[in-house]
């Protein structure tokens, strides 16, 4: 078997490709392990492979082809991804490490080795990110008028004004917290910015103080350059920015630390932030009230174990050691940071009014079908497939809005996972209830990091008389479903929308997702039955058309792979195409290996984590794995089987991970219309698989290679081609 290569992370530009070279450990395998495809070398580690994905995001931030504010956006996304990775995944591995648990995943890499490799790669990635910001991006933004400056760069007039501003507006809000036997070490919130300060009093005694940067003040202070101090009307966000200097709040605070401690000398100080474990679990079986249990969970996150300490790279050894002792950290959990800390907050600056520094936005295709005319009559005749953001998400909003206003609609049932801050879907559901319709909302309270928002929506919907269900005990409801029940010509007709992404108008502009709207009787009956399972005590293991986890998805998917193998043995034309976000499940991976070993052509486009190792002679040589990272987050899930020409296609909410297949309520819906299947395969799948601009290909040695068109080859940027196709698209 081939060996993994590469001893470090490096970004290479050579000829036709960029390459991510990543060291990956090999482990010995027995003949039995190879026979039943359980050899750990056949599986890539999910945590290490996730870092590969975030490296691709960073590559976009470093690309000179990206406009400057797009580089800033990708850099902020890279850091936000990394924060969540430490909060959840690294926290979980750290818990395994401390408990002496073995790695239960197929790659069998121990928690200790994973933590060491995560640290090594994180240091390499963040070093590149920090260097790019300090040496390239920040100076270029400064030249183009987005002036993020240090306090020492300000004019004397600006400093005089800021002196009054600090004393009048910031100083009263600050709360220094002494740390001594009478003042215990304070609870520090995850990812908030703080100063740790070492003081010396008149008796030359040393004291330590923590000072939090107030999170209810803007971190970005916009200071006009060319006005008299008395005309400085506002220091809040200024989208116009052209005449402003932008100073970070922590930089201003650092200039006035002595003011906070009269009678003391500031010996040293450093900015720091911690990351806590937020992957806490609810004992749902013991909870009397799920909403209150989730509310308590959000509160408990304040006290999760500290996973990571980030501290300014010039911090003294005394300050680092003091925090390490108080937070009970080991050296591998400490990261020294050059440049701004908490860079994900810099996404705010993407909103400045500098369109020439951004990629032009797109106007998704808006179908008249959902705005005017006989929408329901059309949907009775044919199914509709939407591909966002190229098809505007307004079509989905209009479908639900018109249903809420239609006097013949009797009921609307809706799942909500991440609805966003200002949800037109929620408003439509409330309007439907006010018009006397039966409205049901299954609100998943356990959607990570959206719990508080979902609690707010659930309470608001309940207050308006909507029947609200708080998810499902023991399972997350991740399915994307809307059911409309309508009286037509004396009988009941149903319509459903089944999506791959959230009912969120904001993320629908930047995620690629698909949606099916149909009146197919079997599909509508399945969705009706599933809502009864989620809202009542109905129990169902099999459905007419839908694949529904946890009972009825893994088995049918495995059976379709086995059937493709059998058909290939008979006809020699077997092919499988999967496009999804994550491929982690060992059972699915082994089934795909067996398909490849039988000669079936397997093409996988996996945007994020992929634990399958392609291109291994005799095992996965018929499998290719690619990943697109571009201006939109690839989020669609499409599963296609050739089936000897009688092809089968499903779209839906489920990725190929144990959590999706076994621990969530997910739905995959068949595309029953042959013409729609053809269009999705030819116009979406094949175009994305042909991309040679934004695509990375996973190699057998666990490296990712960025594809580039050959000298005479046509460049294919799938996302840009989708934009062009939808601009000229005829209405549905």
Predicted regions: what they are:
Residues 2-576, 594, 598, 608-732:
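N-terminal localization/anchoring segments of enzymes in phospholipid and broader phosphate metabolism
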């Amino acid at each position: 078997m081939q060996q993994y290569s590469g001893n470090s992370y490096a970004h290479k530009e050579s000829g036709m490709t960029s390459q991510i070279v990543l060291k990956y450990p090999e482990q010995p395998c027995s003949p039995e392990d190879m026979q039943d495809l359980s050899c750990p070398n056949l599986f890539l580690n999910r945590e290490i492979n996730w870092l590969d994905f975030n490296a691709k995001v960073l590559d976009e931030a470093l690309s000179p082809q990206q406009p400057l504010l797009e580089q800033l956006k990708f850099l902020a996304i890279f850091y936000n991804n990394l924060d969540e990775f430490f909060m959840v995944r690294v926290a979980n591995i750290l818990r395994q490490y401390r408990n002496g648990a073995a790695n239960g995943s197929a790659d069998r890499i121990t928690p200790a080795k994973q933590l060491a490799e995560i640290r090594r790669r994180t240091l390499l990635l963040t070093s590149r990110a920090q260097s790019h910001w300090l040496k390239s991006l920040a100076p270029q933004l400064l030249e183009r008028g987005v002036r993020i400056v240090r306090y020492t760069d300000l004019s004397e007039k600006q400093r005089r004004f800021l002196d009054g501003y600090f004393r009048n507006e910031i100083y009263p809000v600050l709360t220094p917290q002494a740390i001594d036997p009478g003042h215990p070490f304070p609870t520090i919130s995850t990812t908030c910015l703080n100063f740790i300060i070492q003081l010396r009093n008149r008796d030359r005694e040393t004291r330590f103080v923590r000072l939090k940067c107030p999170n209810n003040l803007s971190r970005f202070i916009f200071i006009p350059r060319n006005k008299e101090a008395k005309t400085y009307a506002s220091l809040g966000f200024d989208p116009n920015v052209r005449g402003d200097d932008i100073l970070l709040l922590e930089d201003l605070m650092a200039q006035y630390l002595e003011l906070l401690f009269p009678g003391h000398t500031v010996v040293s100080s450093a900015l720091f932030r911690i990351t806590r474990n937020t992957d806490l679990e609810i004992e749902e079986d013991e909870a009397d009230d799920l909403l209150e249990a989730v509310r308590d969970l959000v509160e408990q996150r304040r006290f999760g174990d500290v996973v990571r300490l980030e501290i300014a790279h010039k911090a003294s050894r005394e300050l680092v050691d003091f925090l390490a002792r108080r937070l009970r950290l080991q050296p591998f959990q400490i990261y020294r940071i050059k440049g701004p800390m908490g860079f994900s907050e810099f996404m705010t600056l993407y909103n400045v009014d500098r369109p020439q520094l951004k990629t032009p936005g797109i106007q998704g295709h808006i179908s008249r079908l959902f705005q005017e005319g006989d929408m329901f009559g059309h949907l009775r005749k044919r199914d509709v497939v939407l591909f966002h953001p190229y098809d505007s998400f307004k079509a989905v909003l209009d479908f639900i809005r018109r249903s809420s206003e239609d006097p013949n609609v009797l009921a609307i049932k809706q799942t909500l996972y991440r609805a966003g801050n200002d949800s037109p879907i929620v408003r439509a559901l409330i309007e439907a209830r006010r018009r006397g319709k039966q409205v049901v909302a299954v609100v998943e309270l356990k959607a990570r990091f959206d719990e508080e928002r979902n609690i707010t929506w659930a309470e608001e919907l309940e207050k308006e008389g909507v029947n609200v269900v708080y998810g499902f005990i023991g399972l997350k409801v991740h399915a994307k479903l809307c059911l409309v029940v309508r009286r037509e010509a004396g009988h009941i007709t149903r319509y459903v929308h089944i999506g791959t992404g959230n009912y969120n108008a904001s993320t629908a502009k930047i995620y690629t997702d698909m949606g099916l709207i149909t009146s197919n009787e079997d599909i509508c009956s399945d969705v009706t039955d599933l809502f009864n399972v989620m809202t009542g005590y109905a129990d169902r293991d099999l459905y007419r058309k839908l694949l529904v986890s946890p009972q009825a998805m893994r088995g049918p998917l495995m059976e379709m792979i086995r059937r493709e193998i059998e058909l290939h043995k008979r006809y020699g034309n077997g092919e499988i195409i999967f496009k999804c976000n994550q491929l982690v499940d060992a059972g699915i991976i082994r089934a795909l290996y067996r398909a490849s070993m039988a000669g079936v052509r397997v093409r996988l486009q996996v945007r994020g984590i992929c634990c399958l190792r392609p291109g291994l002679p005799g095992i996965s040589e018929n499998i290719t794995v690619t990943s697109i990272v571009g201006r939109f987050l690839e989020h669609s899930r499409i599963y296609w089987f050739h089936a000897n020409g009688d092809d089968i296609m499903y779209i839906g909410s489920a990725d190929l991970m144990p959590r999706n297949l076994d621990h969530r309520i997910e739905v995959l819906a068949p595309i029953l219309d042959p013409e729609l299947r053809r269009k999705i395969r030819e116009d979406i799948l094949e175009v994305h698989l042909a991309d040679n601009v934004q695509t990375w290909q996973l190699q057998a040695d666990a490296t990712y290679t960025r594809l580039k068109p050959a000298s005479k080859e046509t460049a294919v940027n799938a996302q840009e081609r989708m934009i062009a196709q939808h601009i000229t698209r005829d209405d549905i």
